[in-house]
Amino acid sequence: MNQLKNDRYLKALLREPVDMTPVWMMRQAGRYLPEYKATRAEAGDFMALCRNADLACEVTLQPLRRYALDAAILFSDILTVPDAMGLGLSFGAGEGPKFARPIENKAQVDNLPIPDPESELQYVMNAVRTIRRELKGEVPLIGFSGSPWTLATYMVEGGSSKAFTKIKKMMYADPQILHALLDKLADSVILYLNAQIKAGAQAVMVFDTWGGVLAHNEYKAFSLRYMHKIVDGLIRENEGRKVPVTLFTKGGGLWLEAIAETGCDAVGLDWTIDIADARRRVGHKVALQGNMDPSVLYAQPERIEQEVKQILAGFGQGSGHVFNLGHGIHQDVPEQSPKVFVDAVHEYSKQYHK
């Protein structure tokens, strides 16, 4: 594998000294880029794009051609794992994901296979290998998965949800069924992420998009417990380097201390948290990723720069901060905004790393 030319993202995750704060954007390969829309049209549909290693590689690299990003993230979807379990995933035009066979009972959970990453999910590993080759060591490649809880919400609800009534009914009325599902998902995610690491991912991230809808104790019992299991099961060193792991719960500011206790290297922050407060609470144990509100990118360049400066000042001196948005970039942001954002992070962060 190629020698890494820019490793400040990996170093910051391990709280090692860097020359400036590294930055990437959640959903940086995506619909806000006209070239992404063209490639997706060429693929035919979203899952066809995910399954074509060359096209998945192309959209992964597109934002790196425009912006001085410090990491690439695999272009894929969190629902690849439940799809490989045979639930019949589809994406309707202009609609969110739908599962033809949602999980309703114990028998269905018992019959769910644990997917083999190098067979049912081989297309993801092929994409990782292709992207890693084409990156030529410019920046590291991030692999990722959804968290067991977040994957389970889609599998039980049958798609996206606002109220999460079906999965919460299962959680309170039949908790043993949900625990069995989450346990199987955790085992599947461990295999999946370890396969991504073996294929060339140099860091991994677990997206717990819906952990924040849970009550205080239920978050720990039904979400964090299974992310902890994943952290314990991951390959943490490959190609002679540590492979850092980041856990991100949207709405997880209440539980930063508990998340930091899992043994992860970094905790992702959404925009509702004051990064100075987060660093005071857990900065001695983990790196922090975040946490600008993605909607700031609608603002004028001066306002974007002001927000970047504020977050950098909030984190303060030294390494241990990966700058990012607090969630995925919106698809209709002005074309120049991401460049203003990325360049501002690099320019204004140097003073914090002297």
Curated annotation (Swiss-Prot):
Oxidoreductase recorded as keyword: no
Subunit organization: Homodimer.
Family assignment from sequence similarity: Belongs to the uroporphyrinogen decarboxylase family.
Residues of the site described as Transition state stabilizer: D77
Pfam families in the cross-refs: URO-D
Cellular component terms per the entry's GO annotation: cytosol
NCBIfam families found in the cross-reference section: hemE
EC code: 4.1.1.37
Keyword Methyltransferase: no
Record keywords: Cytoplasm, Decarboxylase, Lyase, Porphyrin biosynthesis
GO molecular function, one term: uroporphyrinogen decarboxylase activity
Binding-site positions, substrate: R27, Q28, A29, G30, R31, D77, Y154, T209, H327
Enzyme type, top EC level: lyase
Main localisation: cytoplasm
Pathway membership: Porphyrin-containing compound metabolism; protoporphyrin-IX biosynthesis; coproporphyrinogen-III from 5-aminolevulinate: step 4/4
Catalytic activity: uroporphyrinogen III + 4 H(+) = coproporphyrinogen III + 4 CO2
Designated name of the protein: Uroporphyrinogen decarboxylase
InterPro entries: UROD/MetE-like_sf, Uroporphyrinogen_deCO2ase_HemE, Uroporphyrinogen_deCOase
Function: Catalyzes the decarboxylation of four acetate groups of uroporphyrinogen-III to yield coproporphyrinogen-III.
Compartment(s) of residence: Cytoplasm
Organism: Actinobacillus pleuropneumoniae serotype 3 (strain JL03)
GO biological process: protoporphyrinogen IX biosynthetic process from glutamate
